[in-house]
Amino acid sequence: MKPPTRSQNRSDSQAASSQKDQKSNVENQTSLAPPPRPGAPTASDTPDYFNSMHNPFSLEPNPFEQSFGGNPADTPGKSLLPSVAALTSPALPGTSSASGYNWNNSLRSGPLSPAMLPGPTGPNDYFDSIGRGFPTPNESSLRTGLTPGGGGSMFPAPSPNSQALLQQLQNGGATPSTIDFHRTALAAKKNNSNAPTSNPNEQEQAAANMDVKPARPADFTQHDAADAANGLFMLAKGGQANNAPMNHAPMSNDTRAAARRVSQNTNGTSAEDASDHEPAKPAKGKGKKNTAKAPAANNRRKAEDAPKGSNKRSKSSMEMPSDMDDEDDEDDDMKQFPMDTKKMTDEEKRRNFLERNRVAALKCRQRKKQWLANLQNKVELFTSENDALTATVTQLREEIVNLKTLLLAHKDCPVSQAQGLGPLMMNGMSAGYDHHGYNMPPNMGMQPGGIPTQGMRR
């Protein structure tokens, strides 16, 4: 048997070493098994700061998953909002079936629906006078074909939704709502039959009744109910022309003038008729004559009504125009009403105002006098100072002339020749007094804004 070579021994040693390494690796693997996975954390376990598996928020239920996890179910018995078509024209068939609202008895489904009543057409709208504070008493809202901007009718061109309703009203078909409009208009006309107007018929009624005392016509404003009734009446007629002749007085822009004319027609006539049968009572204010003699002596009554302290007002009242006479007549008519407390209050206010004006004017005059006195004192002071300065300037000028004379007299002195003053005195002082003193060149004199010394002499 041959002995093993060196190469075989080397291979056997490598195989043995590899087997030992494998055994050591197996032993290490069996001895260093991975640690078991930690179980689920419980409430008693303290969460680790570096471990995200111990977060307790993962165990809390998510409210959003519970809310939105299932299928959405409608609320049983809920009502849907009406559609846009139902809101615009709820009277159309099929619009009220989608919602649970019943629009049959609503104001939006009748003749006053938004489709029939358009928006405002401008300042001359038909409903512009509703809610006004002081319209003309004889102004009526039952006008057809006279409304400015109405195009010959009360309403502009109707919309297609209300065309059928207008045709039905114009054909003469009286529906129950039309009958109600007629009844409302008649009732409103009956209630407003005794309203104060500017017609002369009420003057005869007031003259026939002697016991009626003049009262202030305060019911000039139209009631909202009457305006609504008149509007419904015109709406029920469907644009038909009004056959009843109506005499409308022109509307005056000055409401105060209208109120004055009405008060003269209603109260003035009744007061004159009552004064023929019973003596007139003296007024509580200043001594004024009765109303029967008032038209004949307007100027005399105005002179008596003027305050005693104001003579200028009484003189100027004799030359007032006719419109001022009307205002005085209105004031006399207003004095007949029980307004003594307010009138005395106004009189006291006027007196206080005049007193304040008098005190303010007195203080103003005193301040003006004081200011004038101070100004006069300042003028006198400045005048005396100016005279003193003028005298000083004159004295200095004379002294300068004397000094020049002395210098000219000593021009041949050896001291002046030694100092070189001889030619200087010959050039600058030989001509006597020079305008530019001290031998200054002409361009170096006083500036244009200055005051020359010769101009100070007075």
From Swiss-Prot:
Superkingdom per UniProt: Eukaryota
GO cellular component, one term: nucleus
CDD domains (alphabetical): bZIP_ATF2
InterPro entries xref list: bZIP (IPR004827), bZIP_sf (IPR046347), bZIP_transcription_factors (IPR051027), TF_Aft1_HRA (IPR021755), TF_Aft1_HRR (IPR021756), TF_Aft1_OSM (IPR020956)
Keyword set, alphabetical order: DNA-binding, Nucleus, Transcription, Transcription regulation, Virulence
Pfam family, one: Aft1_HRA
Annotated knockout phenotype: Enhances the tolerance to oxidative, cell wall, and membrane stresses.
Region (Basic motif): 349-378
Record-annotated bZIP domain positions: 347-410
Cellular localisation: Nucleus
Molecular function terms, GO-annotated: DNA-binding transcription factor activity
Stretch list, region Leucine-zipper: 389-403
Annotated family: Belongs to the bZIP family.
Function: Transcription factor that positively regulates vegetative growth, reproduction, and osmotic stress response.
Name the record gives this protein: Transcription factor Atf1
Species of provenance: Penicillium expansum
